[in-house]
Amino acid sequence: MKKFVKMLVSSALVAAMAFGMCACNGNGGATQAPATEAPATTEGATEAPADTTASGELIKVGIINNDPNESGYRTANDKDMKETFTKENGYEASFFYSLKNEDQIAAAQKFIQDEVDYLLISAAGTSGWDGVLEQAKKAGIKVILFDRTIDASEDLYEASIVSDMAKEGQQAVDWLASQGLSEYKVLHIQGVMGSSAQIGRSGALDAKVKAEANWTIVKQQTAEWSEETAQQIVQAVIDSGEKFNVIYAENDNMAKGAVAALDKANISHGVGKDVIIIGFDCNSWALKELKAGNWNYDGQCNPFQAKYIDDIIKNGAKQKVVIMEEKGFDAKTITDDDVAKYGI
């Protein structure tokens, strides 16, 4: 399989270099998959040769991901990858997990030495990947990004199957603005700094606060996706006596930790209460909290990218970028069907 891939890589790279990766915002005439099937929009069409298992050899893939214990989203994402990249489906898969960019890059170098056919990467951080991707290119190894974008030339990877994190953040901020508060005092709990999820979700809020005189950030601090750390951050703000009426947490786990601190201090939260709660990912348990009125808004982040990667490997990259279709949910309008259909 390795020799076969090396024969194909030249034409693949020529095709990939012919097209710039499209911006994550906007649909550009893209099609959408049914909502029950991890929906996606696609942009920037480009053809690439398909891989095959006709020789009887397994396709060797090195999969670099964030820690599955990071969040419910990541657990679902890892499960999806493991259920797809199996021997029965034609793959020999090796997995590496870390929340640190430098560890992930070192793992990529090791996978290159192991002569994998494909590197599948969900990057912990957006920067620093050019060198190792150049190494992969020289070795004839194809790279597919999933879940998160990186700052690297598009000719260094075959395709990108990602969430539009900036759009997720903008949808949440637009919803918050629509609530018509006279004053917004926001406690902002961030994810791992430098990740595309943090950059996108933080960026929308930062821009709104800069533009509006009645929007204020009371506290902005990373909890690195941790429920426990988020609880500690909120508890410290409560203890300081600083007033806030919005918690903008960049994932569900951190929102859960924030709510635990509010409950401990007997501060009401949710629909019609003292503090608005915003989370991201749409874990099933979080959507149930939303439906119960304990939270106010949850932004979807779709973790089911594996089938798109499998299709690209076996049938060729028909587009450079696949953007997962995602929406936000309001406690006042979410239904039991939404919880069942979109909860992860």
Task: Give residue spans per PLM region.
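Short, low-complexity disordered leader/linker segments with a strong preference
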Residues: M1-K60, E134-I141, A340-I344
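Hinge/cleft segment of the Venus flytrap/periplasmic-binding protein
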Residues: D51, E57-I59, I189, M193-A197, ...
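Extracytoplasmic "Venus flytrap"
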Residues: K60-E88, S94-K110, S122-S127, Q190-G200, ...
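Short, solvent-exposed amphipathic alpha-helices that sit
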Residues: G72-Y91, E168-A172, S196-W215, T229, ...
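Short beta-strand elements at the ligand-binding edges of bilobed clamshell
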Residues: F95-Y97, A152-W175, H188-Q190, Q220, ...
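Hydrophobic alpha-helical
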Residues: I105, I112-K138, L205, K219, ...
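Flexible loop/hinge segments that line or gate small-molecule binding clefts
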Residues: S127-K167, C282-K291
